Amino acid sequence: RKQEDAEEAARILSEDDSKVFGIASDVKNFEDEKTAVSEIIKKFGRLDYVIANAGLGIFKPVDELSLEEWNDMIDTNLNGVFHTMKASIDELKKSEGYFISIASLAGTNFFEKGSGYNASKFGVVGFTQAAMIDLRKYNIKVSTIMPGSVSTYFNGNEPSDEDSWKIQPEDLGELVVDIFKMNPRALPSKIEIRPSKPTS
């Protein structure tokens, strides 16, 4: 959501600003997502790939979960994916592009203190899979990736050596690139990925 963070991420990806640039956008705000797509079209002329990756997790028993916390998770995790897809869908029709949502194994596996997070991720999986069926006729490919534990800054975590057993961000990056490289006749519509070994 912060422009400086988006610009720093862009610098890490490439120093050539003709190939990459950062845009701050709040996925809870549909107008933000529309503006982001407009900026992409203005700079590159087309939109081929969209990855919906924003996420928020608040883990409490349901009787302690506030209405604001519930709405924050639903607005970010579920409505955010809808906003991102809705804002980009016309351009993806033109390019016959690819939309990927990063869901979670929590989208099919419920757990204690996960009522709000589970609800949002179950919703993302259902929404993205239904959208995949809707959009195939336009030659738009839609996939859902459902990771297990990933070593990121999610939910206040500070990645460290203790996270070495987890999926690393670059593992997910490689998976996404592999999906894009597949023959267009094949559509991996739902992919589960988890650490190969349990927590040590």
Predicted regions and their residues:
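Residue(s) in the substrate-gating loop at a strand-loop-helix junction
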Residues: 104
